[in-house]
Amino acid sequence: MAGLVEKDIRLLLKRKQTVILFLAISFLLGFTTDGSFVIAYLTVLCAIFTASTISYDEFDNGYTFLMTLPIDCKTYVAEKYAFCIGGGFIAWNFAVIFYFVSAVIKGDSINLSEDMMMAVVFIPVYIIMLCIMIPIQLKYGGYKSRIVLLVLWGIIALIGFVGAKALAGLNVSIDGLVKILDQIPDIAFAVIGIAITVLIMVISIACSRKIMEKKEY
């Protein structure tokens, strides 16, 4: 697995100019927008960037070559999830540090417990996003997966919009729902969030393994 990780790192280093550009944009956003935005931006961006290594693997019969090495489909899938999630976590740490540094420089007030709780919310979000992206990219390839993901995000946005309209039509107060949720202990939210994230990850990994096993090399 170490060899696969090194391969992916070298693939990303070939795009170091893009990485530098993204970091520069993150730096500007950190000082010109709400600092919390840079945490979401940099974490999600890195997750997408690391997942793009799948496209390189399939290019020019790359899978055929990889499967001649002493690895199997399970090892490849495990490495891909570990690399993408690990890369996103590194970016998250960098973004959190940058958030606090920029807040100090701008003279913004800092509430460590609330700010960290806000930042931690982005971890399961980007992991779930990766759990959706990776099997789709393995199944449909680089080009088709972009179309599938675009349609999927559109459907999710439409469901959210229709759901909000339906609640408004039923005279259900969004603020009332928020107040009810605020009464739930933070630890309960954390346990539920972790459980849902782990469940989605297990299902996603199982799907990715089946997709890789069905491929012809």
PLM-predicted stretches and their roles:
Residues 1-61, 79-217:
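Hydrophobic alpha-helical transmembrane segments of membrane proteins
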Residues 68-73:
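Short helix-to-coil transition segments within interhelical loops
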